[in-house]
Amino acid sequence: MDQSLTQDRPLAAVFRRLGSELMPPVVETFDRSKTIFFPGDPAERVYFLLKGAVKLSRVYEAGEEITVALLRENSVFGVLSLVTGQRSDRFYHAVAFTPVELLSAPIEQVEQALKEHPDLSLLMLQGLSSRILQTEMMIETLAHRDMGSRLVSFLLILCRDFGVPAPDGIRIDLKLSHQAIAEAIGSTRVTVTRLLGDLREGNMISITKKKITVHNPVALSQQFT
């Protein structure tokens, strides 16, 4: 395989380039809070996130929904069948956390692409490894009973995965509503609004056009320790 195909290129871009010879990729858009797939849906396509953020959550019998990952641009998801080698139904609830644009392809054609271009497997493994790490961090975040600690932990995860350097700190490059944050950490909009207000008063964060800037992540991490 030509190394220029995979070197320093997002996985979605690689599959888009391969599209003419291997698969007809489909580009879809979803508004915020729209479901991409439900638990139990047939696992028929693999998704590559082009723009925005996608929330993966696990839904339990009691109706409780726990966020396990927040995917950023260039992430791949819906790949459980590829990993196990067996056809299976969807395990997670995938929802557009922001307006998103996705590239999707039939799972059979992705399997064929991986067979013909083995280097793609390494790219996919790297992406999955990053997601496993984030899932562990999300579980630790939701283990906090105190909502202030949950919010701070969540903001630090966002800094790591969506943060860009800014003159006054790290700007989380997502437009986040208070409701969206509340849904991600298992809280309420009213509580999140109050807690964000406290952090602003303490000069820990600032918010401009729904984008949060964390002025000092280290200082923020010490707020609820």
Curated annotation (Swiss-Prot):
Q: Which InterPro entries match?
A: cNMP-bd_dom (IPR000595), cNMP-bd_dom_sf (IPR018490), Env_Response_Regulators (IPR050397), HTH_CRP (IPR012318), RmlC-like_jellyroll (IPR014710), Tscrpt_reg_HTH_Crp-type_CS (IPR018335), Tscrpt_reg_NtcA (IPR022299), WH-like_DNA-bd_sf (IPR036388)
Domain (HTH crp-type): give its ranges. 145-218
Which positions are annotated as binding a nucleoside 3',5'-cyclic phosphate?
Answer: 9-131
Q: Which organism is it from?
A: Synechocystis sp. (strain ATCC 27184 / PCC 6803 / Kazusa)
Alphabetized UniProt keyword annotations: Activator, DNA-binding, Transcription, Transcription regulation
Q: What is the protein name stated in its UniProt record?
A: Global nitrogen regulator
Biological function: Required for full expression of proteins subject to ammonium repression. Transcriptional activator of genes subject to nitrogen control.
| Highest taxon, organism lineage | Bacteria
Spell out the SUPFAM superfamilies in the cross-references.
cAMP-binding domain-like (SSF51206), Winged helix' DNA-binding domain (SSF46785)
Q: Which CDD domains match?
A: CAP_ED, HTH_CRP
Q: Which residues bind DNA?
A: 177-196
State the Gene Ontology terms under molecular function: DNA binding; DNA-binding transcription factor activity
> What gene is this protein translated from?
ntcA
